[in-house]
Amino acid sequence: MSKVNTDENNFINNNNSNNNINNNDNNDNNNNNIQNVSNQIENGLLSNLPTISSSCESFSSKSHSLTERRSSIKNLLDNFSTLLDILEIPQLMDTCIKNNSFDEALQLESFAKKIYKQYSNNTVIIEIIKEIKVCTRSLISTLQQQLRQDITLTNCIKTIGYLRRLSIYKENELKIIFLHSRDQWLINSLKFDITNSNHVTYLTKLTDSCRTNIFDIVTQYNAIFSNESNDEDQLDDLILYNWIQQKIKVYINIVDSTLNHIKSGSSISYVLENSMYFSMSISRVGIDFRNLLEPIFEKHILNNFLSQITTANHHFLETLKTYKFPLQKSTSPTSSTTSTSSSSSSSSSSQYISPPLSILQHQPLAVLVNLILKSFNELKDCFPISLRSIVILKLKELIISIVGGVTSFYNQLLSNTISNLINSPSTTTTTTTTTITSSFDKVFHSFCKCLAEDFIPFIVKCFDIICSQQLQQQQQINDGSSSSSSSNSIGIDVDSLVLSLKKIYSTETQTIPSTQNNNLPPIPDLVLRGNKNSSPSTTTTPTTPTPTPTPTPTPTPTTPTTPTITHSTPPSPLPSSTTTQLNSNNNNNDNNNNNNNNNNNNNNNNNNNNNNNNNNNNNNNNNNNNNNNNNNNNNNNNNNTDKKVDERKEENIIKEEEQPISTSTANKNDIAIETITTPSSFSSSSSTNTKSDEEIIDKIVQPDPVVVEKQENEITNILKDDNETTTDILTDNNEATTEIQNNDQSLNPDPIIQEIEDTPSEVIVNNNNNNNDDDDTTF
């Protein structure tokens, strides 16, 4: 055990010794290496020392910049919330605008401007300011959009205040922006509130909307811009009134164009009332345009009235052309007069008058009175006093046109009847024609009498009541008292207007019977040639008298006379042709004298030219007549002949003339042909020494045996020139018809003439009127 230990120790010692030897060797090697390294380091340091110095300096500078960056980052972290708020200003401002938080948006805009003044070179601040400008434009657009909506006065003031705080616009520019925005709202409100409807509803809604909205806009404008300084130009006040003038002009144009489609008087009155209320409402802010509305409504009211009465007149005249007058039954004139007077008295006692019942007997007059009363009712609702004189003038023209149309119709009818009598050789046809015409005269005279005494006075009275009511209302408005107006205060002289009609139905023909030869038909011997400026003339008709002789006056040798002379006064003051009236009754000469006395001056004025013109024609046919006093007789001899009268009829006529004539009695079938001459009141002619109407009427010429021979020669000459005279009659009738049409363009009597020419041959009339009162024969 010990040996082992000894061996181990020896081994250990040997190892230690060996280790020591090795360590010594290693130490020597290390020392050598260290020496070598130190030498190398020393040599390297000495050679690389400048490089090391520069590197240190570089490191030092880098470390300094890093230190500064570190400090700035640390400062940024410390102020992160503030910087975040600045960066979020544009986004926050946009959010405020969208939420209508205009105060906060304006505060952010003001804060951004302050930052920009301090850090105008900062890139971040510049970018923020660019975004702020975009948001500001959005803010202005939003504020203007609010002004284009239905906004209250408070919000208007706030909105304009926001625009003022932006300091972008001047005061005048703000006014223009305000009015432009509110005008857009007004246009849109009118566009959407007023839908397609009838014209009255459209104007009513338009007027109400304009009245409310324009008044609000003007009130808002005055409230917002009332505190401005007076150093501004006075033209600033014109901004508002120019805008108002434009709006009123547009409104008036719309009213003017829309009223063309409104024909009801009550509707026009309703629109007028709303328009006047509109003007009166905005007059509280200094705007009153009622004077601009008056001519517009007056124009449309007058046009509607004229259109209605023109249509009524045209319808009446056209109806008159084709209307067949029923032959009148024998009625008591007293009862008709009583009914008319009672109706008129009852109507006068009532506030609302009714048409006379006599108008119902004539369909054209009944239709005409309905149309005219309709136009009066339309006019009554909206009748301005300023149109009174114009409407009176138009009403007078209407009455003249109606009277002229009826007179022209009558004249053409009788002219056509004369042509039929001349051209018809048949005794039966001539007798039938004259009998029908005689029956027709009674009906037509009743028609003219109703027109003159009932229809026209009733129309004038109705219009007088309308004028009186308007004048009373105007008087009450002016001084609070009502004034009563006298009857027919409108100044229309009814008597002068219906004078021509009265001459038609009040003319009484004087019939002088001829011989007892009843085998011959009543042939018109002499017919006056028509002249539109001729004086009252006479025609002759051989009739069948009673055998009672009467003394005859002795005429002068130079004056040829005719067997029968009848005369009547001119039926119309209007220009027309010479016509002939057929009458089967013996008329009273006194009434005829009265009618002639009324127009004596007019007849004398036109007598000279007629006599002079006809004298030349008479010289060609009758060499024995040279005096101007015989012109009427010569004219009659030239114009009324029968083309187909043979020698037998001529001899019978001469025999009839030799018989004594009685003016006291006449047979039932005697027919007197009466010439009614209508002188022209519009043509001026010099008056000469001619016989007055009274002298012609009072003188009923009787045939004289001395004159018979002259008449034979005259009749012979007349028969030779019958073709020429007949042509002259037709030519004169055409000239008269042309002149009538020029005076009344709406009247064309040609269809009437053609219808009447064809009618008499088809109508059978019993001459015994007393036994056939129930016949309902029409002409």
Curated annotation (Swiss-Prot):
Q: Where in the cell is it found?
A: Golgi apparatus membrane
InterPro entries under this entry?
Answer: COG8, Cullin_repeat-like_dom_sf
Ranges of Low complexity composition bias in the record: 8-36, 330-349, 533-543, 561-640, 675-690
The annotated regions of Pro residues compositional bias extend over 544-560
A GO BP entry is: protein transport
| Organism domain of life | Eukaryota
Kindly state one GO CC term assigned in the UniProt record.
Golgi membrane
Primary residence: Golgi
What topology in the membrane does the UniProt record assign? Peripheral membrane protein
Q: Which UniProt keywords apply?
A: Golgi apparatus, Membrane, Protein transport, Transport
Recorded hits in Pfam families, A to Z, give: Dor1
What do we know about how this protein assembles, alone or with others? Component of the conserved oligomeric Golgi complex which is composed of eight different subunits and is required for normal Golgi morphology and localization.
| Role | Required for normal Golgi function.
Put simply, this protein is called Conserved oligomeric Golgi complex subunit 8
* Organism (species): Dictyostelium discoideum
Which gene does this sequence derive from? Answer: cog8
